[in-house]
């Protein structure tokens, strides 16, 4: 086979096909059109994000007499409510990432110090379910899994013409002392002259700052070694379980 003949031969499914001059021109034109029509990665991502946002459910979050939207909603009545999770991908991400996004939003709005030693608690009364931020199983499920349960049960209730069916999933957000924060506060008591009578509710916010009396500190050292836990390390280990 001459060089000219080899140049006009292409392989289709490992089979060589001889092209004449007209076929070669058509093939080149087809390749150019294919390149022009092929969408870019950015366009694909934009389309995917648009589709995802259009499928996001309406979920409201109540905190301190304020109503937030968990995700973007097409409901015009809710258009003025702040949106907690602007990133639609969080709907299907592990619960740990989802919770971290809520913490970041609330911290920016109400001050990070208000949540520094607190664990987020999400109460879903319609499902009699409570989600805790530090739960070791958070990385095994997503919020999408939780909402799917609500959706299936709601649709069955509607089919059975039940009453008092919620129009959407509502969440009540609250906080509670983190175990590791309370534990470390108790460790501090063992390093002073404190007794059980000194056990008081732990607080470390702007309204009730934690005050340590230097004169009372270390007057009666406990000879036993007590381990102090780090919040970040504790959460990280839970995420890996």
Swiss-Prot record:
Keywords: Cytoplasm, Meiosis, Nucleus, Ubl conjugation. InterPro entries: UPF0646 (IPR018822). Disulfide bonds: none annotated. It is found in: Cytoplasm; Nucleus. It comes from the Eukaryota. Sumoylated. Pfam families: DUF2420 (PF10336). GO terms for cellular component: cytoplasm; nucleus. GO terms for biological process: meiotic gene conversion; reciprocal meiotic recombination. The keyword Nucleotide-binding does not apply. Present with 1820 molecules/cell in log phase SD medium. Required for normal levels of gene conversion events during meiosis. Belongs to the RMR1 family. This is Reduced meiotic recombination protein 1. The gene is RMR1.
